[in-house]
């Protein structure tokens, strides 16, 4: 990594990972911040606000919740709020304490602003119903940041759920060189092309950082998050993202070439990798089905040993999302 600005950013990230591994009190502090979620007052403000639509960056496509009227109702309400109270949602997102003034852009953080997210016990069930509305709001927030911010570094974070992307963002948000951070899956990179192009066209530097973990470690992290916060991760989504990510990154590298920096962080070893071929080799653990089998083996072992609750197992085995 020869870019001195990027080198400083990665050094900060590496120090953060070392502290997480070596200082239990620091890990507890960071996890407390992560699991706090959006303050209830922000959701209340959105509910009280009047209609204030703004153009959205994309169409919100509803998922099919046939036979599940509760989820269908959650989805309809989320879509209505996203289209009718867009300005209030974006303003609340900027004030969300975990977003660094709105610079950290993540659809999961937008979910915290919807009424269905208020109860932790309901979050795993509500997740899919809020997904598409939150994804479009995240794209809209990214466009707003490009409109109002001076060009800096736009960092795209990706990796299997449970890799530690959101945890890592806490360190990177403190670095003023990072103007925005967009967390999202790049295993199917088509939706990322216009976002990255928009950043480049406005003079921003763009780097993609893939955070890597073994499937088993990622599963342990999502299960821990489920019990602490209510949102875990399905095996289908985890395996699809990890199994397809090397090809997705290769497609992005082929399209943008030297206009972007492609990097990987192995959270298991602490290694930073900036050679595209080495990144592909490190991240390639097999196709989605191979990774799915590893995850199922580990989940079954936890279940057989009595270390897994029925609710945690159910959320890991079910999703409406298709990747």
Regions found by a protein language model. Give the residues of each.
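Glycine-rich phosphate-binding loop of ATP-dependent small-molecule kinases
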Residues: 1-323
């Amino acid at each position: 990594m020869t870019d001195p600005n990027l080198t400083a950013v990665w050094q900060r990230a590496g120090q953060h990972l070392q502290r997480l591994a070596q200082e239990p009190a620091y890990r507890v502090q960071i996890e407390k911040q992560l699991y706090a979620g959006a303050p209830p007052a922000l959701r209340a403000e959105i509910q009280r606000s009047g209609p204030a639509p703004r153009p959205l960056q994309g169409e919100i496509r509803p998922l099919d919740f046939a036979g599940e009227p509760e989820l269908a109702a959650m989805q309809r309400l989320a879509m209505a709020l996203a289209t009718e109270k867009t300005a209030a949602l974006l303003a609340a997102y900027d004030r969300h304490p975990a977003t660094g003034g709105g610079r950290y852009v993540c659809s999961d953080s937008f979910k915290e602003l919807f009424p269905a997210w208020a109860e932790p016990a309901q979050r795993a069930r509500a997740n899919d119903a809020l997904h598409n509305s939150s994804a479009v709001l995240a794209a809209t927030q990214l466009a707003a940041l490009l409109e109002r911010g001076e060009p800096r570094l736009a960092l795209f974070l990706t990796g299997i759920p449970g890799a530690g992307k959101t945890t890592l963002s806490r360190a990177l948000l403190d670095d003023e060189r990072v103007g925005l951070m967009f967390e999202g899956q790049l295993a199917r990179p088509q939706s990322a092309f216009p976002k990255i192009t928009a950043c480049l066209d406005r003079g921003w530097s763009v780097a993609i950082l893939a955070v890597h973990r073994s499937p088993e470690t990622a599963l342990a992290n999502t299960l821990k998050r489920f019990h602490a916060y209510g949102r875990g991760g399905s095996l289908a989504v985890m395996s699809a993202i990890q199994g397809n990510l090397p090809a997705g990154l290769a497609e992005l590298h082929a399209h943008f070439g030297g206009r972007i920096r492609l990097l990987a962080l192995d959270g298991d070893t602490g290694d930073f990798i900036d050679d595209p071929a080495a990144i592909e080799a490190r991240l390639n653990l097999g196709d989605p089905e191979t990774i799915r089998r590893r995850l199922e083996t580990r989940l079954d072992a936890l279940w057989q040993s009595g270390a897994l609750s029925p609710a945690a197992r159910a959320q890991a085995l079910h999703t409406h999302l298709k990747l």
